């Protein structure tokens, strides 16, 4: 078997990626989230495939087909809630994974980091088009509001929106194409995740100390296969608890009402994992400015490798930067809360302050803190 895994062309790829891969001996539980994201992706593709077998992408039958899945299909309710809550789980793991990358300076592997940002954009696009498919009130109005943002683009905006809609409003054509996008995008994400891994394995993993660990690396199997397996069991336990006991906790009650173009919900808002970006969008009174801020709130991550001023890679021994990092985490939680609140005082001003703080920490305060820490260490 040993000879085969080292000589067979297919087995060799698996061997180099998951068995004999040299891995730092001191990577913590925060490094588990990469493999957990892979698990979430497989889970989403499998549950999605079974849902697609029963779903119909037509405005007249989409809502009732989802109801049919929950009521008449054997274990359909379980598959549907696993898929819906699996998206939330995916984004929890994704945000922790990005947070770990920022904390430990993993963004200095620029190719891996940039592909990761592209993966984040694709995942957000997949989640958005997927949220439209049940054709409930929030699905319809969410699709209308978010796609309408593109009309802020000068000259081509309105044409672009109508092109995406396939008409003059969100209708049958929109739903059909969104279903097609939602089906194909996860496979593109899977292919990109392979490229993400390919570039990661070119450089090797970073570690909590942020220093080279070539002299002490250990094989991935059995150490990290066991660790990842334990992480997967813990994650699935939490996930199934959520699915079986609190299936609607993270959803919107408005989505249990069929889409009605003549009745606008009192508060149109996306799923909870987009609320931070939605709050940034709403905090700018100008439409084009809001759209630019929304895109830049994610795109700003691509600037991190160029804003790294510290002589140390990780934040493990940098108290000033650590304080700023946890302030950023708190700020994102506040933005998420604000995104779900109505547009009225005091939420407007809180959202604006939190948005300014978000960009200030990343673009100004973190680089300055790095320089101050260098001075403190006389570097």
Swiss-Prot record:
InterPro entries: Cyt_b/b6_C, Cyt_b/b6_C_sf, Cyt_b/b6_N, Cytb/b6-like_sf, Cytochrome_b, Cytochrome_b_C_euk/bac, Cytochrome_b_N_euk/bac, Di-haem_cyt_TM. A ubiquinone binds at residue 201. GO terms for biological process: mitochondrial electron transport, ubiquinol to cytochrome c. Its cofactor is heme b. The chain crosses the membrane at residues 33-53, 77-98, 113-133, 178-198, 226-246, 288-308, 320-340, 347-367. Heme b b562 binds at residues 83, 182. SUPFAM superfamilies: a domain/subunit of cytochrome bc1 complex (Ubiquinol-cytochrome c reductase) (SSF81648), Transmembrane di-heme cytochromes (SSF81342). Binds 2 heme b groups non-covalently. GO terms for cellular component: mitochondrial inner membrane; respiratory chain complex III. It holds the Pfam family Cytochrom_B_C. Keywords: Electron transport, Heme, Iron, Membrane, Metal-binding, Mitochondrion, Mitochondrion inner membrane, Respiratory chain, Transmembrane, Transmembrane helix, Transport, Ubiquinone. It is a multi-pass membrane protein. It is found in: Mitochondrion inner membrane. GO terms for molecular function: metal ion binding; ubiquinol-cytochrome-c reductase activity. Heme 1 (or BL or b562) is low-potential and absorbs at about 562 nm, and heme 2 (or BH or b566) is high-potential and absorbs at about 566 nm. Component of the ubiquinol-cytochrome c reductase complex (complex III or cytochrome b-c1 complex) that is part of the mitochondrial respiratory chain. The b-c1 complex mediates electron transfer from ubiquinol to cytochrome c. Contributes to the generation of a proton gradient across the mitochondrial membrane that is then used for ATP synthesis. The cytochrome bc1 complex contains 11 subunits: 3 respiratory subunits (MT-CYB, CYC1 and UQCRFS1), 2 core proteins (UQCRC1 and UQCRC2) and 6 low-molecular weight proteins (UQCRH/QCR6, UQCRB/QCR7, UQCRQ/QCR8, UQCR10/QCR9, UQCR11/QCR10 and a cleavage product of UQCRFS1). This cytochrome bc1 complex then forms a dimer. Belongs to the cytochrome b family. This is Cytochrome b. It comes from Cratogeomys gymnurus (Llano pocket gopher).
